Amino acid sequence: RSRGLGDVYKRQGYELLEKQSYLNLLLSRNVDAVLLIGSHFIENSPEENRYILEAASKIPVFILNGELKGDNIYSILCDDYMALKDMTDLVFARGSESPIYLYRTLNYSGQKKIQGFLDSCAEHGLDISQKNAFSAPGDLHKACSILEQLDADGISFDCVLAADDELATGAVKYALKKHLRVPEDFQVTGYNNSVLAACSTPEITTIDNRVEYMCVTSVSQMMQVFQKEIPPSRTMFSGTIVKKQTTK
């Protein structure tokens, strides 16, 4: 028992065939329910989500911070779209004129975040046909390097909104290397309200995406299903801006 399910939870690959294999492994263990953590389980193609629908025909499936419609599927998520839109509105209100966005992936959650950013930019008069969102799949050092390259390429930006706190930490590192005052000259925001936001100097303004609430709700709804009750198929929490030292 030292292998098997323990290895499933430790693996970091999320390719479709891997996900199907892991879910089938869980089903083979005759589990009572499945909790899928993260929107990386949700694909853009309905056909690629079929394996989840098939699993839900056998046992309840709960999706944490992702959404898929189907019988016996319960989605508990944060409103990532509105959270990022509100954060982008905030930096505009605090004087930013040319913000950019750093993201890791464009999964379900990632698409909601980037759309919130772009919609806010459009509402504030920015030309969103010009690229102002950039992929940054690496660690904080890679994020810093990407920003340095953007600057070298002549792309002007006075604020970085990041899809998570690690990317935001990379943006703070970039600002320090460029001798930019944060937040007077350069604003930075993160996402997830993780320990990285608190460990950074200055501490990073971030978004609390209510992970604790989502976890408690998912377990509560799972118990309701076991007791033959019918919880809502979709539960959405609002993200909260945690104002710290990297925004004006």
What do the PLM-derived regions correspond to, one by one?
Residues 72-101, 111, 119, 139-148, ...:
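Hydrophobic alpha-helical segments within soluble ligand-binding/sensing domains
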